Amino acid sequence: MPRLKLPKSFKDELESEKTTTTSSRKKAPVVDPKQTLMSSFFTPVSKSTDTKEINNKEDKDEDKDKDKDNKKTKKSKDTSDNEDMVDDNNKQQKEKKATPNKSNSPQSPQTSKSPLTRRSSANGNSDSKIDNKEKEKEKEKEKEKDKSTPTKTTSSRVKKDTEVSKSIPPKLSKQTKKKQISSDNDIYDDEKDSEEEDLEDDHDDEEEKVVVKKPSKPTSKSITAKPASTKATTTTTTTTTTTSTGRTRVNRVNLDISFSSESEEDEKPKKKIIGKKRKKKDDSDFDSESESDTISEASEVEPESEEDLDSFKFNSKKKNNNKNNNNKKKNDEYEDEEEDEDDELFKDIEMKDKPEEEEKEEEGDPIVIGSGRVVLPKGTPDFQPDPKAGKKLLKAHLEIQSKEEAKRLQQANGGGGDGGGGQIKGSDDEDEEVKKPTKGGSKASAKKKGPAYTPLEQQYIAIKKENPDTVLMVECGYKYKFFGEDAEVANKVLNIYSYVAKNFLNCSIPTQRLFFHLRRLVMAGYKVGIVEQTETAALKAISSSKSQPFERKLTRVYTSSTFIDDDIDDQLTSSSPQFLVSFYESTPKNKNDDVIKKQRDNEEEGIDSSNESSTSTISFVAVSVKTGEIIYDTFKDNVMRSQLETILTHIKPSEILIPPTTTTVNKQKVNNGIGTNHYYFSNLTSKCLKTYTKSTNVRTQAMDSQLYDYEYSLGKLIDFYEDESNNNNNNNNCEDVLKFVKSTLNKEQIICLGILLSYLNEFIHFGSILKVESNFKAFRVSNHLVLPHSTIVNLELLVNESDNKEKGSLIWLMNRTSTFSGSRMFINWICKPLNQLELIKERQDAVEELVNGIKTNSPPIVSIISLFKSHIPDLQRNLSRIYYKVQCTPKEFLNTMTSLQRIVELFKEINNNNSSYKFNSTLLNSIFKLQNDNKDGDSDSFDYIGGEDKLSKRIKYFLSNINKETAKEYGTVGCDKSNLWVDLEKYEKIRETKEKIEQVEKEFKNVLKNIRKELSKPSLEYHHMPGLGLEYLLELPPSFKAVPKSWIKVNSTQKMARYHAPEVLEQLKILSQSRETLKIQSQESWISFLGEFSVDYSLFSNFVNKISNLDCLFSLAKVSSLEGYIRPQFVKEKKDGGIQIENGRHPVVEAILSGSDGSYVPNTIELRESACKSMIITGPNMGGKSSLLRQTALIVIMAQVGCFVPATSCSLSVFDAIYTRMGARDSIGTGKSTFFIELEETSDILKNSTQNTLVILDELGRGTSTNDGVAIAYSTLKYIVEVMKCYCLFVTHYPLLAQLELQYPTQVGNFHMGYLEEKQDQQLQKSVIPKVIFLYKLVKGAAQNSYGLNIARLAGLPMEVIADALKKSNEMKESITRRANLSDGKDQQQIENEIKSIIKNWNSNRTTLNSNDLLQFIEKFKSIQLKL
């Protein structure tokens, strides 16, 4: 075989190309010169010598059964002259342009040699054709190149998707395209002809192409994946691909390899990713004829120039021999196309602009390719689910924001350069990414091409980027859609179907179900935004951007505290004010950082390092968007944060604003402008809030740290009020409100208010509620009976302890209100009873007068009853929605005004000069007085003299401006309000647009006249189909032949065909545009009309407050009318004060038993200042001790609320607080045991109680050993008696505590719950448990036994256990008796001598014997069991 000599010109060109390649690329693969020469020049001459020639032959020859031996014979004949072969190739390259073939280079997973190399070696022809000298020269050159460009190798696998460059670079130069060097790392593509360029343009948004660098070689060839029916040698390659959702597929592809020069591509390549990382496209990106899903992973190298990139686009096709396997792959492709689209965008955002990476493959290990996807080893099962699929949107956006910020900082600092490929594109670049490249890509942008986002997806991405923490509901025609991560939330919470469409997971809801599903998302704790279409089809058609998508904007945002658009009358949610609260915790002043840090550390461990460190000053401001209330307070709290718990229990917030959470939380300092270093929240405060939010599912929102700076927050408030004052949109006088805020609120509260303002500004007009001065109310616990959190829970004021439901609680019994605002106020009355005697008596007088009126059916009471029986909407919420303008509908406005008008008329009727309607109660008379219009806003005067009151005047004004019948039909926010106004003279634009619509309608009539004449059909009329949105249709029978050709057929039936004439369509276009304009103008006029209401908001709000007060008083009157309820008496004198309840009953238990045959056993209890002030209550288990405690406390609460109480007589002092220590619970979250919480609550009681406090302690000390429990209980009660001197009910099972009565006979009394014990023989006492009958009556004296074994028997414990317990109980009693006797024996003689001495002294000098000597005498006398 003669050796082949390379042409000198080609050698020179080869050297220049290699020099360029080495200097331009960053890393170049090592090329084996032997294999390169073998594959490029020493191929046997055959039909496969030239790819173009083979393709031409194959197109003509379709005989599939041609003899393979003939083929080999032909190949051997053409091997005589290789130089002729090279010349032949160059000649054919010039003569014709072959159809470009799509390259595909499968690699063998186990060997570095290609199949064709092995085949050539077997024939014995390849090695003999190589010149040894030439090989040595090539090896030396390649070694030098290898030293300068080290490479990494990875195995190449065939996969579905391929790494692509985002930009389409220019075409290669002609010289470069003619000659390229073959390398086992390269993929070759021919220059694309015009037909394939057109095809690429058509599928630009769906196809992904790999752009690679090609070294020059003598002849440009490509490897083409051919059908199995062709005559070329085929090989099968199996690959594994991974979809974006983590599912894997195993693919097998039959590839046709035409000649050995291209077969070298099968060798293991050195992988190099061009440009920045790009995400793979889904299966739909490839040729529709090739429905299999494999494309080979090609070896890629850096381009020498941008022009080199264009002509090498990897666009491979594949076929499968097995038809069944092919069908299966089609199904797989469809399924993965749906799944892969889900997170294409997000992974692309995450992966793009990152530095290039290369990963080595270890045998059997997963392969990480450039896009970040993992190709699993062969044999991995198909379709493995990825539970984290589709949840990367928020993470991606946060990453984008951080990179954009870094880019801005770099530019600001003068940084430039390429940025390492890590910079994020701006919005302009995103718009460029979705544009199609120019034909052929020769003039394509240098920017990278991204995924094909639809216009709607682009809008979603932009809005989501600005609101990453918001679940977006995007309006799309008659649906609201969710995308991506938001769709997953909707799928989980709403339980609706989700599917993959384009680049996102999608799901949708119909428009009419918006608020139903919105409410579910909000109540689940999500922040939800409504993205609405701000354009209509009619206006879009005439706009300059009619080719663009509909404009959409985020118009409304809701959370659990700001959701007031719900029209569902849910008592559970409507009774809640839905407070949004912000807290601020002040650090101790005059403390250095070390001291503060030490105290914080002690707090973490629950250690009270000092009196000052255990307390904390906390401020808060709470806003109710629903009711308009703004409450504020500052209080000092103890280590238990009991005051904070009490505040949370009272206001029941729906959302809490907290400081930013960082890894150094509670250690980060802020200059708060108050002069101290602030540590945000202490650990104890944070734990308290965290425990509360978890147990109640309250939403928390972290705020910006700068908002906790005093100067910053004050500046925000000043700007807000000054801007509102300058706008002159209302007469609320924002300057006065600002003065009020500065003078009334302290600095900490101003910080909280600034935080709330900043948060409310994110919503629609909610910040305007802060402009009403009358909304601000101080939360003064000292003005009311203090009921801490533990008391509200233990006494079951709001919910019962068994299942946390309202039934069985005090509010369940007493709340008989008829209005929503009244219900909210009544809950506040129960949690904050009065503590001022004058106010209590004033309320009692009003309740008593209403009770008498109910019993006598007096006319005013009958009118009030009829009023509250009628439907009254939530006036408080509706007023707030009217004040916010955009939230109110005409129907809601009409209902609110008509309801207020009806109530005002009733008030005027009751308040006239008719004596039968006069009330004696001062409180009732103040409620029914209306503000006189002549007083002109003087809030201190509410006298009605006979003229028209201001409220009635304003209601008439608002109702006179709207059409009541039309307003009833306008029940949605975006409804057409064009016919709402009575007088159009005030709205000139609306009148002009209506006139234009009338002209169009006249034109329709003229068009119809002309059509009648033209068709000779005088009876022809327009037909309208409102259900389909079709109007002005012309109906003709199908048999009618004279229909003009210009008419457009809309629809038809067997009897009728409907058309639109061109003249009609032209007028319809004008009509639609005019209607949309009218709708916009009507909405603007409606907002302007509601703006007039803001002037009178305070007037209407005060009146609704009167209605709520009347509703609450009427509710108390209904309860007080129950049988057996009496008016309690309050005494001023301290010596006569205390608790004297005769035959009192538990109000809730009695109400529950009233439905059955049972009845509650009344009890009399007396705690007097001059007599027994503390009661020790003992007795058997289940004897009624705890019920007696709750009964007493509930009667006190009901009395101070102003209600009658269940008793035959009741005399009380005015108490300032009720503290309780009942039940047993632990707090795992804060690391507190049951006994620790028990002692914490006891400590809090002892620190805060006064002489006018009622303290209830139930079985204190039971959480520890008997000795410790007795000691703690004894010491606590003794401290209460000696030091605190408060009213106390102390329940215990410890007999030792009964001895306190001996020490303090005038202050302590022993009582027990009565019972009857069945007498038994003395022989059976130790073996049989006696039967006990509970009497549930309070009896004087201490109980001797608790009868715990009787309860064990009732509970169903096994008899063996009970018998053993009885035996052990008897043994313990005997042991205690023996020890007592021994002790008594030792001291008996000494005590006897002392008693004799006392008696002797007493007899000798009775006048000097004091009471203590007598008590000591009695105690010692009893201890030795002597009888006088």
From Swiss-Prot:
Gene3D superfamilies with a match to the protein in the record: 1.10.1420.10, DNA repair protein MutS, domain I, MutS, connector domain, P-loop containing nucleotide triphosphate hydrolases
Highest taxon above the source species: Eukaryota
Region (Disordered): 1-391, 405-451, 592-612
GO biological process, one term: removal of nonhomologous ends
Pfam families linked to this entry: MutS_I, MutS_II, MutS_III, MutS_V
Stored PROSITE patterns: DNA_MISMATCH_REPAIR_2
Skewed-composition ranges (Polar residues): 36-48, 100-125
SMART domains in UniProt: MUTSac, MUTSd
Keyword DNA-binding part of the UniProt annotation: yes
Record-level Gene Ontology MF annotations: ATP binding; ATP-dependent DNA damage sensor activity; DNA insertion or deletion binding; mismatched DNA binding
Keywords: ATP-binding, DNA damage, DNA repair, DNA-binding, Nucleotide-binding
Comp. bias (Gly residues): 413-424
Biased composition (Acidic residues): 186-208, 284-309, 333-345
Compositional bias ranges of the Low complexity kind: 217-245
Compositionally skewed regions (Basic residues) per UniProt: 270-280
Comp. bias (Basic and acidic residues): 9-18, 49-80, 88-98, 128-149, 346-357, 592-601
Cellular compartments per GO CC: MutSalpha complex; MutSbeta complex; nucleus
Record family assignment: Belongs to the DNA mismatch repair MutS family. MSH3 subfamily.
Function per UniProt: Component of the post-replicative DNA mismatch repair system (MMR). Heterodimerizes with msh2 to form MutS beta, which binds to DNA mismatches thereby initiating DNA repair. When bound, the MutS beta heterodimer bends the DNA helix and shields approximately 20 base pairs. MutS beta recognizes large insertion-deletion loops (IDL) up to 13 nucleotides long. After mismatch binding, forms a ternary complex with the MutL alpha heterodimer, which is thought to be responsible for directing the downstream MMR events, including strand discrimination, excision, and resynthesis.
Subunit structure: Heterodimer consisting of msh2-msh3 (MutS beta). Forms a ternary complex with MutL alpha (mlh1-pms1). Interacts with exo1.
Full protein name: DNA mismatch repair protein Msh3
Species assigned in the record: Dictyostelium discoideum
Lineage: Eukaryota, Amoebozoa, Evosea, Eumycetozoa, Dictyostelia
